[in-house]
From Swiss-Prot:
Location within or outside the cell: Cytoplasm
Catalytic activity: (6R)-5,10-methylene-5,6,7,8-tetrahydrofolate + glycine + H2O = (6S)-5,6,7,8-tetrahydrofolate + L-serine
Domain of life (superkingdom): Bacteria
GO biological-process terms attached to the record: glycine biosynthetic process from serine; tetrahydrofolate interconversion; tetrahydrofolate metabolic process
Cofactor(s) listed in the protein's UniProt record: pyridoxal 5'-phosphate
Modified residues (N6-(pyridoxal phosphate)lysine): K230
Protein name according to UniProt: Serine hydroxymethyltransferase
Pathways per UniProt: One-carbon metabolism; tetrahydrofolate interconversion; Amino-acid biosynthesis; glycine biosynthesis; glycine from L-serine: step 1/1
Pfam families in the cross-refs: SHMT (PF00464)
Origin organism lineage: Bacteria, Thermotogati, Deinococcota, Deinococci, Deinococcales
Gene3D superfamilies: Aspartate Aminotransferase, domain 1, Type I PLP-dependent aspartate aminotransferase-like (Major domain)
Amino acid sequence: MTTADQPQAVRDDAVFDLIAQEAERQRTGLELIASENFTSAAVREAQGSVLTNKYAEGYPGKRWYGGCEVVDQVEQLAIDRVKQLFNAEWANVQPHSGSSANLAVYNALIQPGDTVLGMDLSHGGHLTHGNKANFSGMRYQMVAYQLDRETERIDMEEVRRLAHEHKPKMIIAGASAYSRVIDFAAFREIADEVGALLFADIAHIAGLIAAGEHPNALPHAHVVASTTHKTLRGPRGGIILANDPEIAKQLDRTVFPGYQGGPLEHVIAAKAVAFGEALRPEFKDYARQIIKNAQALAGEFQQKGYRVVSGGTDNHLFLLDLRPQGLNGTKATRLLDANHITISKSTLPYDTEKILHGGGIRIGTPAVTTRGMTEAHMTQVADLIDRALKGEDVQAKVHDFAGGFPLP
């Protein structure tokens, strides 16, 4: 028997044991990080397939390597499915991540030093929307819009004022910690007023858009980028969508040969599987349940006296302000981690805590919804989190509760 024929456990016990530990952690814990989810077995099988052996620089029908007749079909299938999913004229499925997709959008459509208007990171934006530690903040002149202090929602008149004042070449509509519907039509209206391109980053809400549970960005945005995991429930990776053929050409050239060489065809195959799953009627039910669960869970916390940022949620996530409880995001994360409840710490609009700690936590329901939880289970989820935040040891109860919901 060759090494390649041996079972994984025989070939490398150290790695296999760690994978088994992670599988057990996922099985017995409560996963409430808004950007995480559980893929289907079919997605994992595709990603772990022999397609990982194949180099395929270029695009279907235009490769630099021979032997690409099969991976051409795989990639084209992914392209066709994601175009159908988002009603797009063009798609690129090669970006390795959401950040690399965003990088390609910037470099294809604007120049270094150009002004870009995006959401402030501390108000729910993303690192790639202009943070000074990120390429976006280093290479471009970034202007940030913030949420309304009272409503904690996007203030479109403030966006308009900043757009007219700074005349950005690009406006970004999208967020990583914003719980309300994004009005892409209103963003496009402002972009047109100042002659800017509208870039929609839908990484967090892509699955909700695909299911019709959030307005589609593409009829309004010049370009759309997203991850393929999170609410879309696929492998970790990125996509870019557009309708304008000239913009599409620029984006294709920027992804390859501009920033990437060989695409990860095993990941693209897994993307194709996930897109196929998202096209099924039951995915609409899943996306709808994500939102129902998030709203129910937010309501449970409000009944317990916690402050939910903006008063609720329209999507898959919400933010809890823990400052009234004498906690910050870092302290809360430690308390919850000790009980095998995973969330992410978060800054809050107009936060008074240091950015490294944040004044609260971000909670999301995609993963627990994948496991089969419904609104009825959110009472117990909220109770376990509340007790853990108060210093109780609820680890055994978390294990018992989570163990009743199988992983896909």
